[in-house]
Amino acid sequence: MAEAAGGEQQLLVILDSHGIIFRSYYALRDVLPPTRTQESISAVYGYANSLLTVFKELQPTHVIAAWDASSATFRKERDERYKATRDHAPDDLVPQFARIREMLDAFRIPVVMKEGYEADDVLGTLSEQAHEQGTAVIIVTLDNDMIQLVRPGVSVYMYRPYQKDYILYDPDVVRERFGFEPERMVDYKALLGDPSDNIPGVKGIGEKGAKALIEQYGTLDEMIAHLSEVEPKRTRTALENGLDEAQLSHELATIVRDVPDVVLDMDSARLRDYDRQAVTDLFHELEFRSLLPRLPASDGDDAVAPSNEPEGDYRTITSRADLDALVTDVRAAGRFGYLVVADSAHPVRASQCLVGIAIAHDEGQAAYIPFGHAVEEQGRLLADEGEPDDAADSAGGQLRRDEVFEALRPLFTEPGLQRYAHDSKYGMLALGMADASMWPATDDFDTQVAAYLLGDANMSLQRLAFTRLRVDTVDPKTFLGTASKAIPFSKAAVADVARYACIHADMVRRLVEPLREELDEASLLGVFTDVDMPHVPVLARMEQWGVGLDREVLDGLDRDLTSRIAAAEQAVYDAVGHEVKIGSPQELSHVLFEEIGLPRTRKTKTGYTTDADALEPLRNAHPVVEAILNWRELTKIKSTYVDTLPGQINPQTGRVHTVFSQVTAATGRLSSNDPNLQNIPVRSEVGQLVRRAFVASDCGEDPVLLSIDYSQIELRVLAHISEDEELRKAFRARKDIHRATAANVFKKDEADVTAEDRRRAKVFNFGVLYGLTAFGMSTREGIPRDEAEAFIQAYFEAYPSVQEWRERTVEESRERGYAETLLGRRRYMPDLKSRNRVVRQAAERIAINMPIQGTASDIIKLAMNRIDEELLERRRSGALARMILQVHDELIFETPRAELDDVREVAKRLMPSIELAVPLDLDEKVGRSWGEME
């Protein structure tokens, strides 16, 4: 960013800072996660992005940032309504102002402000002075108020959020866009008003009327002077009645161009050699990885921003001698990071399309061993033994896969070496299912799991390397392409894949120690070492086994659902009296709320919401609602499962292999995808029909499924954590907890508790885990608010320690910034300190739920780890039973019937993995299919 040359035309850019800051914040706050230190960065990122765009697109010689000094301005004194509807800056935005000032200082861009005036007035004054000096000016803003400043030599560069681009307003563009001269924008605002600034305008005059008046009379003064001539009459009447408001609005909308003591200093505004290191350090701290390459050069720098990719001894191994030497080096180092490269992101499918392996045994020392790259102009894969040597030569000397596996097998299977990976479950499955002898021993460190425990919102290796090591990795999209033009790894240049893979493995190797230190400092190393890392191979084996699927059951269900959906459609048509596009929210909204006249739900852009939560309370209001909800359930089940499951059967195994993730849910719960087997409805008839398609198979003689689930585990955890004696006594006595709760709350004998009493007690027993409020209960149960409040009061009188625990947990979590489980797993929640009541209360509900749901998840994980270890040992002795699914509180085993009693004994002995103050009861079912278990 060098100084302008002697005779170069000067261009001053003035930034409407607060406009950019607020728009950036609201546009990005739900898109851009906080940094790993929980710092909100949406406004800073948006401002930085705008600034770098200005540097590139406008190439200014001078830049000034106009700033609001405070909210107290002469306009506020003139009219207390001015901007009165605006909320205070959100809590997480306030600290970002200082960060932006820090960034501007590093870029050596002066900030100009004046007490009692807004940034708009500073902009107006500076642009006026620059114009008088003959300097070209461009104002960067998102506010069309600035258009009044446009003239020859002064332009406005305005961001259009919906088009996601900028438009440069000069006088010609203003006339084309608005139909009047730039200086008439003040008169336009005087008539139309400005809701964002709470400028009233003239009631009864809209955009069309305002433009017509300006076209005929020009200024507001001329309109007033010819008031009796204004037509039509309704416009004249509106103007007569709103004359005072129009004149006030004109005054408020006028940008001051002569603010006292604001003097243009072109010398300080000149873009000089900026502090590139300070900007780079700040961008690293704020995790602005994508912005670093866009930094302009400063004096003494190259024009192109230097690459921050790591330098190292990265090699491609194509000979057995070099491969053996690598193995020797790794053995000497005693540890290594690795990456398995394959053409599929699904770990089981990856085993069938392996491309290569990268290994890093020391910092900056990594090698890539290709064996599955396309040969003969990327026409086919080189994979297994038996491939002719000349084919290997035509693939650039790739080794055969069997030869690579033979050499690397000791590194992955011997217990003495430490193995590190990012998403090590993927590598385990890809290697182990490609060749059973390559199934890795347990990895010692998974950088993805570590980042998850530390609360990183973005757990990608790219982000971890950037935030911890200040290093850029290679994005594979740069050589694989994207969307329809994307190619697989096997068809990419070996050199490109090698560099990417070596850097990846090297970064994994380098990240282990800093992440281990962070885990230790946060007291999370125990959870990492004792719970989550041992859980990785458990999930890998469950994915390896997969689940059997009966195609005939699915085919029959497909025919059944097709018939039911047609009947449900007809039921909707009959209830409405004509056909309707049930899948169109807009058309459905019109039918329900305009034609039928049902109570209106929440307003949307296209009508009123028709989502399930909104329609459920209306189920009994009209027959069409029941029919719509039925149609939706049937079509969702059909499209999500019945139509897609057959295509997800692995042709090599004949089974469905879901992908489990322990790094998705913030509470530590597992999630399942591709396909998601955890969201099949459990209580609906059609959900049970889908579950019937999942069957025991390929597991010895007379295979069966055994389901064992924890009975009300979260309520039992609540009884333990809250130390509520009434709750504990009920569980210890093996009582029906919902009946016991109803008896306590309604002050009845348990024998007198009705089904409705019990149902309502059950709602709140579970609702208390999620912070259910009187409003929530009133809405859910359709009961008066005061009745819900009375029930909640009676509940906490019955279980006073639960209420005390809830209040204590929220306050402790607010003070610490996180809630935690019994084992110390954390969930960070900065929103607990939000000034926004809705945001804060939502965080409080999460703080109440996290220790309960998270502890229950920890209990289940520990149990799974221990069960898997024992079943694995039994399989070494010839047993066949295996754990194949985890669905929330339920574990499902596949076993020959002859081993059923043994598996049952193992599960029941090990599932109470943590000793609580109340017993952890278990329920069990057995059956040939998941949907038919008794």
Residues of each region from the PLM?
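Conserved "right-hand" nucleotidyltransferase catalytic core of DNA-directed polymerases
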Residues: 238, 242-394, 456, 480-685, ...
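Function-dense linear segments that define catalytic or interfacial modules
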Residues: 358-366, 370-373, 423, 462-476, ...
